[in-house]
């Protein structure tokens, strides 16, 4: 194998482990674990896991579209009025659709430069806090928010972060996307992040 092939950038994303969460006595929802493993300099953390619900994905798509009007964003799985969170097939179809959405988003260099995407994938912040952080209205930066979440929720041993993609085995439900970045898209940590500017 040639040395340059070993250094090729990759981003792998998994959407897995759907869980029913109680919102209140009458209402429940499903959230999903999003796991990232990458060697891309665009990411603050090389490995991360965070839980998000469907309507947060809807917010993310709207946010990305508003910041990249000329980009045709991939579609999310449709909101099914007859969706049954106790129906395993319904839940898995949505999980797969959410994973496909993220995989396609991460293949687009312009979308990958959006700080909102990184906070969605690698922090605990809700949509309002993400918007505040990206617009500079918080005491913490994007990177600080991600690092704080990583310290609170470390899921991978430190020695694992330097390993190759195939050293991590989640399950059979996985997707990965590879892409390269020119030096024009690089900053101090490899990607020029955008900090420019509901749920259903």
From Swiss-Prot:
A 1,2-diacyl-sn-glycero-3-phospho-(1D-myo-inositol-3-phosphate) binds at residues 53, 79, 94. Disulfide bonds: none annotated. InterPro entries: PX_dom, PX_dom_sf, SNX10/11. The keyword Transmembrane does not apply. CDD domains: PX_SNX10. Coiled coil: none annotated. It is a peripheral membrane protein. It comes from the Eukaryota. Residues 8-125 are annotated as: Required for interaction with ATP6V1D. Keywords: Cilium biogenesis/degradation, Cytoplasm, Cytoskeleton, Endosome, Lipid-binding, Membrane, Protein transport, Transport. One of its GO terms (molecular function) is 1-phosphatidylinositol binding. Residues 10-127 form the PX domain. Its main location: cytoplasm. Belongs to the sorting nexin family. The PX domain mediates interaction with membranes enriched in phosphatidylinositol 3-phosphate. Interacts with ATP6V1D; may play a role in ciliogenesis. PANTHER family: PX DOMAIN-CONTAINING PROTEIN, SORTING NEXIN-10. Probable phosphoinositide-binding protein involved in protein sorting and membrane trafficking in endosomes. Plays a role in cilium biogenesis through regulation of the transport and the localization of proteins to the cilium. Required for the localization to the cilium of V-ATPase subunit ATP6V1D and ATP6V0D1, and RAB8A. Involved in osteoclast differentiation and therefore bone resorption. This is Sorting nexin-10.
């Amino acid at each position: 194998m040639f040395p340059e092939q070993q250094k090729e950038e990759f981003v792998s994303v998994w959407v897995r482990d759907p869980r029913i969460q109680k919102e209140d006595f009458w209402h429940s929802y499903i959230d999903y674990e999003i796991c990232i493993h990458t060697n891309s300099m665009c990411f603050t953390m090389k490995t991360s896991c965070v839980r998000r619900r469907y309507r947060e994905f809807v917010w993310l798509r709207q946010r990305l579209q508003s910041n990249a009007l000329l980009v045709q964003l991939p579609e999310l799985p449709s909101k099914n009025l007859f969706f049954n969170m106790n129906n395993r097939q319904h839940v898995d179809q949505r999980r797969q659709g959410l994973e496909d959405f993220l995989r396609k988003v991460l293949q687009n260099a312009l979308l990958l430069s959006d700080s909102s995407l990184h906070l969605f994938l690698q922090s605990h912040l809700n949509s309002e806090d993400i918007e505040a952080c990206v617009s500079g209205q918080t005491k913490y930066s994007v990177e600080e928010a991600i690092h704080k979440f990583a310290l609170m929720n470390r899921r991978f041993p430190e020695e694992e972060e330097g390993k190759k993609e195939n050293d991590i085995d989640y399950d059979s439900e996985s997707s990965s996307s590879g892409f390269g970045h020119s030096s024009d898209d690089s900053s101090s940590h490899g990607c020029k992040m955008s900090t420019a500017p509901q749920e259903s």
